[in-house]
Amino acid sequence: MTILFISDLHLSPLRPDITDCFIDFMQNEAIHAEKLYVLGDLFEFWIGDDDNSPFNVSIKNEFKALTEKGVKCYFIQGNRDFLLNKRFCKETGVELLDDHTVIELDGEKVLIMHGDTLCIDDIKYQEFRAKVHKPWLQWVFNRIPLFIRQRIVKNVQDKIKEKKQTKTLCIMDVTQSEVERVMQEEGVQRLIHGHTHRPDTHTFMSNNKEMTRIVLGDWYSQGSILEYSDKIYSLHKKEFK
């Protein structure tokens, strides 16, 4: 049994190198897996399931081809693609999961998430997240003409880049106390997440129990894949061609 986890690809027409690496991964690696979990930020920005640009359609086709061949695909929304929803899933065969989802791997309960909710020291981001996740606001946004949404998102992207330059690295990382709280709340000793772009495996003690936190990498300069097989977790790099 092989299960794969990826996140933070930030797919965009402006980065064909990332897209090519992703397509190669889907067609030559994911095809041999039992399941594929995408833990958010698949896209640089997703402005709605009605955006059928040639680029978006090409990515959807990769997922559709994979699910039609029997590979189960699951998706957790990230901070860049939280508007990806039911229509995308219907068109691709992907199953949308809750922000915090507990899965079972060979009898062990494992919590999976995007990871942005763990960065509670970044107060301004958490306030922004709470606003944009309001159902009524998303309902209104999805009914704005597509070309206007594209302009809005472009402005938001520019502001995000400006703010990131002024934030310290520790603020953009997870808060350890929140990690422990969430893991205890969900009753797990293993957590897998993305968002921070810092691939690593962390072990620590909490309430006299050994906990493990696995962080997925981003795809900015190379692909990053977590493979689970024979009860072993392995983080792999995938070089761009």
Curated annotation (Swiss-Prot):
Q: How does it sit in the membrane?
A: Peripheral membrane protein
Is Cell membrane found in the keyword set? yes
Q: How is the cofactor bound?
A: Binds 2 Mn(2+) ions per subunit in a binuclear metal center.
Enzyme Commission code(s) on record: 3.6.1.54
Major place of localization? membrane
**Any one GO CC term of the record:** extrinsic component of plasma membrane
Quote the record's binding site residues for substrate.
Answer: 79-80, 122, 164, 167, 195
Query: What GO terms in the biological process aspect are recorded for it?
Result: lipid A biosynthetic process
Keyword terms of this UniProt record: Cell inner membrane, Cell membrane, Hydrolase, Lipid A biosynthesis, Lipid biosynthesis, Lipid metabolism, Manganese, Membrane, Metal-binding
User: Which Gene3D superfamilies does the UniProt record give?
Assistant: 3.60.21.10
Q: Spell out the subcellular localization from the entry.
A: Cell inner membrane
Q: Which reaction does it catalyse?
A: UDP-2-N,3-O-bis[(3R)-3-hydroxytetradecanoyl]-alpha-D-glucosamine + H2O = 2-N,3-O-bis[(3R)-3-hydroxytetradecanoyl]-alpha-D-glucosaminyl 1-phosphate + UMP + 2 H(+)
Residues holding Mn(2+) 2: 41, 79, 114, 195
- Residues recorded as binding Mn(2+) 1, renumbered to this chain, are 8, 10, 41, 197
What this protein needs as a cofactor is: Mn(2+)
Which pathway?
Glycolipid biosynthesis; lipid IV(A) biosynthesis; lipid IV(A) from (3R)-3-hydroxytetradecanoyl-[acyl-carrier-protein] and UDP-N-acetyl-alpha-D-glucosamine: step 4/6
Q: Recorded GO terms, molecular function?
A: manganese ion binding; UDP-2,3-diacylglucosamine hydrolase activity
PANTHER family in the cross-refs: UDP-2,3-DIACYLGLUCOSAMINE HYDROLASE, UDP-2,3-DIACYLGLUCOSAMINE HYDROLASE-RELATED
Similarity comment: Belongs to the LpxH family.
Describe its function: Hydrolyzes the pyrophosphate bond of UDP-2,3-diacylglucosamine to yield 2,3-diacylglucosamine 1-phosphate (lipid X) and UMP by catalyzing the attack of water at the alpha-P atom. Involved in the biosynthesis of lipid A, a phosphorylated glycolipid that anchors the lipopolysaccharide to the outer membrane of the cell.
The name this protein carries in UniProt is UDP-2,3-diacylglucosamine hydrolase
